[in-house]
């Protein structure tokens, strides 16, 4: 049974509360754009593609409700303004993720164009928006499978062909990933984790490694959860073990695949904090470093990583950890508790993301193919939009 992080049908939306994973499975209903803002900001739902979809669908839910109650304005312009204001509000919940801003801009243009039609009613504008938002959910899964297939083929050619190997592991590659980029971060299948899934399906995956991903532990809580769910051979490591793993030749790590929250026009990539360090390690150890992201994550309006705003999270997310109390062997897991793990009074710097320079990236995997650098070491990402 596939993992479902976003449940939507006929104007009803709920999200899998990822703060409780992997210990509890709880779905939170989303009734409004305000609900979505808080769910995204609190990281009950996270992952650049997922938060864009939840944002879009939350407005669709509000529109459905207004239509059913007969409270939607008949005026096309009023409905257009209502939608655009809601989208602008939700886009402020997590500023680094470009998918959220891109979706708000794209959907806003759709309703503006529709509202300008002669004789168009407010309901027709709302219905046009709802169709576009629902299509985002459908398209994301299809795009992710494309990313998985293109990424797996690239790795099989670049990281496996010609690589040394003997016995059972010959013709296979081990892959390291960071944070969570799977079904829990998207509408389904995933981006970087989708590449791992595709390698596993092709019997070309020797082993998957996932980092703990401090301080929010998306790797240990979420990625490990997905890998176990799918019965993919995998091992969890702490973030600080990555260098030792890459130096451990028998591990056979041939590629590091990560997701992205924003890719600048030159290929500089903002992703979960710790990604930059992994890219430096990959370069030193001769391991391929790949970014997996749909084209909606590519921001051609931002020339380089210097133009990407980096969100900073509350200090408590670093100094405290929440989880269930561990009982005896027969007792299982107890009630959820929060504990402190840092000295009182210590200052905290907690950026949610870092920016990996394009020079450290071997390829950017999109739903239409893998973009590589030219002979001068530059990406030409405009070509994926031609």
Curated annotation (Swiss-Prot):
Cell compartment(s), UniProt: Cytoplasm; Nucleus
Recorded GO CC terms: cytoplasm; nucleus
Gene: MRI1
Taxonomic path: Eukaryota, Fungi, Dikarya, Ascomycota, Pezizomycotina
Active-site residues, Swiss-Prot/TrEMBL: 261 (proton donor)
Primary localisation category: cytoplasm
Intrachain disulfide bonds: none
Name recorded for this polypeptide: Methylthioribose-1-phosphate isomerase
Biological function: Catalyzes the interconversion of methylthioribose-1-phosphate (MTR-1-P) into methylthioribulose-1-phosphate (MTRu-1-P).
The organism of origin for this protein: Paracoccidioides brasiliensis (strain Pb03)
